[in-house]
Amino acid sequence: MNIVNTIKDVRLIIKKWKDENLSIGYVPTMGYLHEGHASLIKKAREENDKVIVSIFVNPIQFGPKEDYSTYPRDLVKDSSLCEKFGVDLIFNPETSEMYPNKIYSHINVDILTENLCGEKRPGHFQGVCTVLTKFFNILNPTKAYLGEKDAQQLAVVRKMVEDLNFPIEIIGCPIIREEDGLAKSSRNAYLNKQERKSALILNKSLKEAQNALESGEKNSNNIRDIIVSKLNKEPLAKIDYVSIVDSITLQSVKKIQSSILVAIAVYIGKTRLIDNFTFKL
């Protein structure tokens, strides 16, 4: 397994692979890898000749009061996981390699970024789309693998790839959970023992909403109330948003008539966690 830090070097390797007509599966990450990332890598390994994982904590997708400086990093552990699951190349550039000068060019995806995390984290998806555009241009993958836990990100990236004619297939992979239901996340490392226990309220509240939908509830306000009521029973939980949106357009819906995304963002202590599920009539 190669670990490469420069655009020049990684392009030389990729040119060789492309000359040999090899397919490339790409998993973009910010590192501190867990079983969720491993599931993406395994899927990429199954479907491609070569697998690349990028590890880069992207500064331009963090707001001024967010956790860029404290985001967990552990390249040794990450490298071990990548090697275990058959990654061919880790691309781990320095910030100065990706952004050697002040960046004037940004990628925005309208409409899909108006709600959910896009509303609560201004500039976040501009940063995500800009860095992924750079990675797609540098790495030239055949397929890219993203987790469904970041459902809005997945929808936004799919639309960006479609609109800008990237010759890349975007593959969404299911949420991976702990045995007690908590969605796997690098930010779970921030939680102390009590917060970790309290964080289970996210999945529990979504389960209640899912049960109501399966029992025939079609009013989105009622579904939202079920989730809010459950979350409010947890003293350490502070709601950032609870949204029921169309799963394609990500626009709010009042009456549930087609496929919807039920998405929540909740602070447990100082840690912001997200979770979701999709429901189809």
Curated annotation (Swiss-Prot):
The enzyme's E.C. designation: 6.3.2.1
Residues binding beta-alanine, per UniProt: 61
Subcellular location: Cytoplasm
Principal EC category: ligase
Superkingdom field: Bacteria
Principal subcellular localization: cytoplasm
Keyword entries, A-Z: ATP-binding, Cytoplasm, Ligase, Nucleotide-binding, Pantothenate biosynthesis
GO biological process: pantothenate biosynthetic process
Further facts: The reaction proceeds by a bi uni uni bi ping pong mechanism.
Identification of the protein by name: Pantothenate synthetase
The species this protein was found in: Clostridium botulinum (strain Langeland / NCTC 10281 / Type F)
Gene name of the record: panC
